[in-house]
Amino acid sequence: MNLYRNNAIMAGVLLIIATVTNMLGNLSIKPILDATDYLIQISANENLMIIALLLVLISAFASAGIAICLYPILKKYHEALALGSVGFRVMESMLYIIGVVALLLLLTLSQEYVNAGASNASLFQISGTLLLAVKTWAGMLGVIAFTTGAMMYYIVFYQSKLVPRWLTGWGFLGAALSLASAVLVIAGLLSSLSTVFIVFNLLILVQEMVLAVWLIVKGFNPSVIASKSPQGE
């Protein structure tokens, strides 16, 4: 029983940490990256960039930690899906780290650009564009990995009734919409800055906060823990 309770609390806390740090990190530097003179602005806001990227790194590790905390519980009900969720969320973490590395390289490029003045400006601009593209594509692929992993553990939650089905159904739908939005962005049919993209991702954002509070306050269904035999074994 302690394993279920402790892991539920840890997963809930990590859900909050992953979401909050990701939002704070990305939103704080968005105006800088969107500026027309971003190569100058990045260098001028070096401290903010470093703090924001540290927050994104925390988010990346917390994201992987969520599935790792859930794995000992979910494997009792469906080991393949539990393992798959860990794999995809670790992949998500790695992709976000790639995005962070791209922005750290962009910070170095920005500093060199400012020091060089007008010399080789076009080369700096091309390099900056490529690094921003790496960050963008890594982020979208990270969303795909996240939503795939999330849908796997929501399926196990739904089948096992460890958490209420209305909450897991909400999570699965939200993850599916978020996955669709990322695929549409990669296909060039949707902008990551569009209202549609934001709406498609809002559902899973709210649901994960509700799930986090549920896991921390109530944990997993005690009647399922006490009496229900593992499924999928």
Q: What name fits each language-model region?
A:
Residues 1-233:
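Hydrophobic, aromatic-enriched alpha-helical segments typical of multi-pass transmembrane helices
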